[in-house]
Amino acid sequence: MKISLTNRVRTTIRERKLFREGDRLVLVALSGGADSVALLCVLRELGYETVAAHCNFHLRGVESDEDAAFVERLCRDLDVPLHRIDFDTVRYARERSISIEMAARELRYEWFGQLRKELAIEYVAVAHHADDNAETMVLNLCRGTGISGLCGMPYKRNDGIVRPLLDATRDEIEAYLLDQKITYRTDSSNEDTRFRRNLVRHRIMPLLKELNPSLQEALLRTRENLEGVAAFYSKATEDFHNTLRATSSISIREVKETPAPFTLLYDLLHPYGFNRDQIREVATSLDNPPGASFFSSSHRLLRERDRLTVLPLSPKMEVPELFGLKIGDSFLDLPDGKQLSWQRGTPADLDLEGLRLPNTKLLLPLAFVESLQEELGVRRPQRGDHIHPYGMKGCKTVSRFFIDRHVPRSRREEAWLLCQGTEVVWIMGYAADRRFAIDELSDTEEYLLFSFGL
């Protein structure tokens, strides 16, 4: 017995848990075409309260405006609230050097996200169906993809997008509309094979069906098999994802112990903007000495002694300086949320415990600070900085000091220096320069005791 479209959608919603129990309000992406019109009508049949959202991308001249007018009439006849928006899609694509298809996709989903917040609606239903998903699987296969790409479109996304028609075919949708005598718009651009999806739909899929007339069923079985594999894989990598989110780093040893380090690294790093070639290079560098850096458009990956650390790129911060500070002040807030504080007094007034170790404190004569106040400043380390570490002989670069102390690269770049001109007085929280250190204290002299917490 052939299942009706309404029952098929009901089953998909239930089995795929598209909506929370009792949640009946849905925003429907309504283009006016057969798929979206059928989706709107079926959801209403199933008792959902619907709100429609229509995008006019202005790609087909008068046709686009006629689509918008049709959607307005349909929503008025069905008493469905409608929200609509106009986009200059061609300009958007040109400014970002992306395809028209990608531009329309970005514009519509960004707007859907805004509408969800404005209307306090949890779900946005889009009308992708089984034929669309088969085309997506083929497209993804042709350009190269992983397990999730071979599965095609997800039934439900984390951003509230749901696809109730994903188990229904195009033929079933059109048969439903014909049976219900429901009219819809036909998009003439769907025949334009300059668009990749249309090329797959009109040329590649018919050829594949010559090889296997039951292509739709075969791809469905493949999808189901891959979904199972994807579920196992997701469970196996869950701890790595959780660790990376919580600490911004992962253990190199643990990555190397997995059966497929590159596959794992691709899964972990691709969401941060790293491409396949970069991730391949990261994977081959796991046994190399530390120090290498890799950059995506949004993040930096640091190859440290025993960990891979991923940090967001941020604009260069302006470092506040100590010149101009009033000795009567007691602290200086730094841009990253850390704080340098100080106390003024004689040795009897100050808490000097732990002054040398772990170097979270620095004692300087008040007279020295007052005389050099205009030359004192706080900044990040830079190439060529040197220090004569207290308790050690000789001089070394600040970078060598960090390496010898096994300080991770990410921590090095977050360090602060108290400097007198070009001289490093204190690697704040790590080591004072012995040239500025005080070996003998005067009971009557006043000092400034600087404190810094890592």
UniProtKB/Swiss-Prot annotation:
<comment type="function">
    <text>Ligates lysine onto the cytidine present at position 34 of the AUA codon-specific tRNA(Ile) that contains the anticodon CAU, in an ATP-dependent manner. Cytidine is converted to lysidine, thus changing the amino acid specificity of the tRNA from methionine to isoleucine.</text>
</comment>
<dbReference type="GO" id="GO:0006400">
    <property type="term" value="P:tRNA modification"/>
</dbReference>
<keyword id="KW-0436">Ligase</keyword>
<dbReference type="InterPro" id="IPR012795">
    <property type="entry name" value="tRNA_Ile_lys_synt_N"/>
</dbReference>
<dbReference type="GO" id="GO:0005524">
    <property type="term" value="F:ATP binding"/>
</dbReference>
<keyword id="KW-0819">tRNA processing</keyword>
<keyword id="KW-0963">Cytoplasm</keyword>
<dbReference type="GO" id="GO:0005737">
    <property type="term" value="C:cytoplasm"/>
</dbReference>
<keyword id="KW-0067">ATP-binding</keyword>
<dbReference type="Pfam" id="PF11734">
    <property type="entry name" value="TilS_C"/>
</dbReference>
<dbReference type="Pfam" id="PF01171">
    <property type="entry name" value="ATP_bind_3"/>
</dbReference>
<keyword id="KW-0547">Nucleotide-binding</keyword>
<comment type="similarity">
    <text>Belongs to the tRNA(Ile)-lysidine synthase family.</text>
</comment>
<dbReference type="InterPro" id="IPR011063">
    <property type="entry name" value="TilS/TtcA_N"/>
</dbReference>
<dbReference type="InterPro" id="IPR014729">
    <property type="entry name" value="Rossmann-like_a/b/a_fold"/>
</dbReference>
<dbReference type="InterPro" id="IPR012094">
    <property type="entry name" value="tRNA_Ile_lys_synt"/>
</dbReference>
<dbReference type="InterPro" id="IPR012796">
    <property type="entry name" value="Lysidine-tRNA-synth_C"/>
</dbReference>
<feature type="binding site">
    <location>
        <begin position="31"/>
        <end position="36"/>
    </location>
    <ligand>
        <name>ATP</name>
    </ligand>
</feature>
<dbReference type="GO" id="GO:0032267">
    <property type="term" value="F:tRNA(Ile)-lysidine synthase activity"/>
</dbReference>
<protein>
    <recommendedName>
        <fullName>tRNA(Ile)-lysidine synthase</fullName>
        <ecNumber>6.3.4.19</ecNumber>
    </recommendedName>
</protein>
